[in-house]
Amino acid sequence: MIVRSLLLAGSLLLASVVPASFTLAKSDGPQIKVKEFDKVPTDVHYFEDTDTIILSGKKAELYISTDAAASWNLLEGKTGILYPNKYHTQSAVIYGPNRKHWVTFDAAKTWREFEVPDKLAFGGGFMPFTFHGKDAEKVLLSAEECQFMTCRHVTYYTTDGFKTVKRLFEGDMGCFWAVGNPAFGEGEPHLPDKLDDRVFCIWPHATPLDLTRRLVYSDTYFSDRKAVAVEAGGRDIKGVNNMASVKKFLLLAASSVGTSEAAIYVSKDAVHWDRADFYGGPKVRGGKFTVLESTNYSIQVNVASRRSRVPIGSLFTSDSTGTSFTMNLDGVNEDKDMITDFEQVSGIQGIFLVNIVENAEEVKKGATREKKLVSRISFDDGRTFKPLKCGDKELHLHSITRPSNIGRTYSSPAPGLVMGIGNTGDKLGTYETGDTFVSNDAGVTWRKALDKAHKYEFGDQGSLLVAVFDEYKDKIFTDEISYSLNHGKDWKKAKLPHRVTALQLTTTPDSTSLQFLLVAEDEKKKFYVMSIDFSDVHERKCEKKDFERWPARLDEKGEPDCLMGHKQFYKRRKADADCFVKEKFKEPLPETEPCQCTKEDFECAAGFLRNKDYECEPHRKVSPPEGKCKNPDDKFMGPSGYRLIPGDDCLKKGGVDLEKEVERTCKDATKAPVSGQISVETTPFKTKNLNYRYLERSDTSSGDDETVILKTDDGDLFVTRDHGKTWQRGKFKEPISLYIPHKYDNDVIYLLTEGKKAYWSIDRAHTFHSFEGKLPITRTLGTLPLYFHPDHPDWLIWIGGQDCKGKKCTDLAYYSKNRGDEWDLLLRGVGKCMFVGKEGELTADDLIFCSQHEHEDPSKSLRLISSDDMFTKKTSIHFDGKPIVGYAKMSEFIVVATKNGTELSSFTSVDGKTFAHAAFPPNYHIDAEYAYTVLDSSTHSIFLHVTDHPAKMHEFGSILKSNSNGTSYVLSLPNANRNDRDYVDFEKIQVVEGVALANIVINPDEVKGKGQEKKFRTLITHNDGSEWALLPPPKKDVDGKSFDCKVKDKGTDDCALHLHGFTERRENRDSMSSGSAVGLIIGVGNVGSSLTPRAESDTYMSRDAGITWHQIKKGRYQWEFGDQGSIVVVVAEEKPTKVLSYSLDEGETWTDFEFSDKEVTVEDISTVPSDTSRNFILWCRPGSSNEIVAYNVDFSGLKEREKQCVLKKESPEADDYYLWSPKHPMQKNNCLFGHVSMYHRKRPEAKCYNGPKLDRLSSEKKNCECTRQDYECDYNYGRQSDGSCALVKGLKPADPMQICKDDPEAIEYFEPTGYRKLPVSTCEGGHQLDHLVARPCPNKKKEFDEKHPGIGGFGLFFAIFFPVAIATGVGYWAFSKWDGKFGRIRLGESQPESIFSRDSPLISVPVTIVAGTVAVITALPLLFSSLWRSFRGYTRLPGSWWGQRQRPYASRGAFAARRGEYVGVVDDEDELLGAEEFEGDEEEDV
């Protein structure tokens, strides 16, 4: 039941005056009793099957009546908000103040007080109480636990009616009962043993570095500290947003990065989950669908249209499984809050009313914003819809989007009685001009009941209709009510004691009572609660002769109709009978008669859909039985496509049976078994330059297409949906200048022309729609023409060029919130503008940052400004308007470069409001003419490359790494190579945490002083840039021969493996690793003392994330990973060939395959960015022609990849997979960043394919004790040659007491040690190198002593004497055994087993090492914001057994982004294919 309160705010106070009583004679009408109130009540709640009512007010006063509103009393000692238990109508809970609450299980006769340790959640998407569907004593409580400025969500539970309240889950995003509805589980044969105890919780952090929310469950209230993740199709369901109980169904909504499409999963047993498919209408988008009132055998969902600027939806109805939805009706009316004009007629199966937008297509196209609303009714469960008829005119009624009363809009449990406010004509008018209409045959026919709009209610099972004039909006008062005793045919009036305007009119929920309650306001703003009692209007109680057997549904002939295998009848009082039923609280129940089975009793079976003729036809090809279909003309007996709807009780005998198998032809069946061959398809294109783009699929994307678009030099656009097997040419009037994929939605792409004209597609390039910008796109070098919003896919910023001279324009920024239909000016004279608001962060949706030229003159310097109202009224000028060089949005940071005289400075913000100055390493100055490039921020730190030497062809610089809030940088790697386009030889290895490769210049002095050519070496880090090492060379080459140099396990200056990096890559989107082929790396290089020219290189591969390497091919090869690494393809680089090589065992063995009958030069090899496909495209050039030939190479036919691999989470190594853990080469255990991570990897010998993307990271993980590898040098400290950290000479550490000044709640601070913990590390205990000696904050000595209690005098004696005695002996022993290297805490190899290792506090503590803790006061808000950020503002605090919170990340670095995981590449937004002018400056180049 939808409850709408239209009452004014205010406190509910009983008036001090004596309540009035107004009584009419028995024959004249109802008896009316009045209570006067000073303030209006805000809610009315009836306890079902009782005369008990509770009223609540704004100040939390509660009043109770036990005689159907005849008298009222204050509910003594209880204030708060009443939450009724909708499944157990005698039960309700009062949400009280000060953590005290009350519960009743006997309709407010008695109350029990209870307390909850934390404040119950209120708002923010959480309800304080979640009731069990079957057990009134089982309740989940949603609470909020806060410390300082950080809060986390906590769920409590009770199973004994609040006698005890226990903690269930910490840091969740909401918990739910499996039995959330009384109907759940009914009729299901196999249900869990403890289904009634099963609880689901949305868990936001499934892994240390994985923020994709899972749904987990427990049958023991998590008492065993075990949570089982919900799966569908053998994969964890990720990105869970919400869960709901709908009759017999559990629904789960999930979303994913890279698409606005949402996935809906359904379960009928709380065990097995299947994704729901939606056919024939718009795709389901996150937050853009509404689950409507449904039945036990079907779910109704309204899906919002993405095309429309005003709210319009499409009505979908599911089959009995809840997993196959078909669109029944398009253009359904809804409001901006997704409230939908849809309501079922109460108590009668298959009848519902809906309002639709008749001019929906015009509205969607933007031709008009005015909706033409018309009403429709369905009598057959949504199969067909008809107009409402009042005589020979069409009738249109206001619905849920325009509520006028509480409760249902049209009907009640009174059988067949339906009322509404509306008008006849061609469309729905305003509510104020509407009249009141009534139907007594469930909507088949209608008559006008009363002039003007009225609030109305049903009583005595429909024998009595009551209405009161409803013009509260215009403050029109009335002193009478209307009532009908004959189903609305005739109406009588009764006087009210005051002239009032009605606020609420209601009665008992079952509509069996003769007593009604009216809440009203008079002209003097006094408020009344009136009890209107019709009990004495009829003296006689109805007898048998006064009732009729009323058929609930009639067919076109007026005969009783069948639905779900039966006819439905009610015992109903005849309209003209002069009696009352007087069976209070006895709701009428339907009688049924069975029908013979007809076509309507069957639904489409799995794999079949209804066509326009309502026949079930195959949605996909039917699989023939084993041994059948040897020839295409063969036939076989297969499924009919129909099945009887579960719960349908029709009689099969003598009826229709559509479930019998039917004969089918083999040519229409699924294709034959795999051929064992690799297939090739070729397509030529007349273009010299290669410009292509994949439209990647995300986790929640539906469909299975593999779409690629290609733009030719002439501006033609080609699209393939089968990965290059077939192509279609786009039909556009103007040549396409460039295409821009949506940065945050992979299904969306924009095509731009040279002028104002542009096109967009939101359905993966299936259809395109045109729009125009206000100005032609900018031609200013380095400026992008389109920017996108991360959460609102239809919001755009358009940068248009004005007064362009060559490649320099006066640029204007416009914004649109409807995909270019309408534009409004943002600013003139801009550099660039971008949305920076993002869900889960402390930023507004409308927050925009712009760099703008002073005085709007493009020859002037840039300044940084921002606004959260589109620059209409509020504009914030940052850095006092001082010049900036540029800014970038990187994952969780906004980084700004400012110009200060001859130096560059960097500032960082995580909330878009407060910027903190980034402290660079001591004595490190960045020349204002130099550049720095933001490389990566995927591990909660910013990697920054700063140019030290900018001479053309001799560029190199330093890689700096920030702390967790981007305010303090330390040197990670000096002399890192870069090129003249500001690309850097730095690449993160995807999936595996903290591993990166970089090339350094080993002769910097010679390059600087003598202009010599750069010489390079390749280094690798396994701990996020804290330590770098040379790559170990392979022991043998591919032919089994030794290299010219040898080492044991580590690379040396004379002998190591060196690989060519990003600056030499021909295709920026290629990468050495893969987001799905975990641990695999391929590169081109050589073994020796330094990197040799690329032409002299060979091809190498690592299978363990860079620990060991193997030569796989002599010479230079291009490579691609397919099927998540189970297929690796390489092909010769820059030389004619017709052969590719592939490996099915991670590079152990290779097979050659001839893909062409003539030699071609392979320009590039590609596959889907996720590397999950078994298809590849070789982009080849025949000879020196100006033609590109696309070769689709399909490995799906291989026998070795015929079946899908099996992964069982409960036994992950039992079948086709094993668990693999990355490691640090200098550690004996597998701890990396404080934890052991285990990844699912397919066994190389397993003959199967991976299929959909795996959840690579296993849930089997553990945190480790802290060691040196979990720390890096703090600010103002530098790494020494032995790996330790020491204070830089001449510098002082920052004041460690700054934390006490910044945080008034702080009790202690720690003396600096020179070390800081890696932001990505989750280690616990062990060696806390950054927290050795604690000191009390000023005036906090007492609290400090309580936290660190001391010892008594006797203990003090032993604390002094005993260590001195022991130290004398131990010191001598240690001196004789130790290597003399006291005095450093090192970040070298870790051997923590010995207490005399360099890790040992016995060695390290006596030596004082002072470190500089960052003391930038303005950084504190950044730190708080960083801690505060999580899904919709909630996060964890330390101490939860579910682990500590980890911040979100998604790498967007200064390299070209094709992989969807953590690798740093150029943002898709910045990669404007087909426009070379834009390649100079990337978004992250500051």
Swiss-Prot record:
It is a multi-pass membrane protein. Residues 26-1349, 1423 are lumenal. InterPro entries: Sortilin_C, Sortilin_N, VPS10, VPS10-sortilin, WD40/YVTN_repeat-like_dom_sf. This is Vacuolar protein sorting/targeting protein 10. GO terms for cellular component: cytosol; Golgi apparatus; membrane. The gene is VPS10. Glycans are attached at N296, N900, N965. Residues 1-25 form the signal peptide. GO terms for biological process: Golgi to endosome transport; Golgi to vacuole transport; protein targeting to vacuole. BNR repeats lie at residues 377-386, 437-447, 483-493, 718-728, 1100-1110. The keyword Transport applies. The chain crosses the membrane at residues 1350-1370, 1402-1422. It comes from Trichophyton verrucosum (strain HKI 0517). Functions as a sorting receptor in the Golgi compartment required for the intracellular sorting and delivery of soluble vacuolar proteins, like carboxypeptidase Y (CPY) and proteinase A. Executes multiple rounds of sorting by cycling between the late Golgi and a prevacuolar endosome-like compartment. It is found in: Golgi apparatus, trans-Golgi network membrane; Prevacuolar compartment membrane. Keywords: Glycoprotein, Golgi apparatus, Membrane, Protein transport, Receptor, Repeat, Signal, Transmembrane, Transmembrane helix, Transport. It comes from the Eukaryota. Belongs to the VPS10-related sortilin family. Pfam families: Sortilin-Vps10 (PF15902), Sortilin_C (PF15901). The keyword Protein transport applies. Residues 1371-1401 are cytoplasmic.
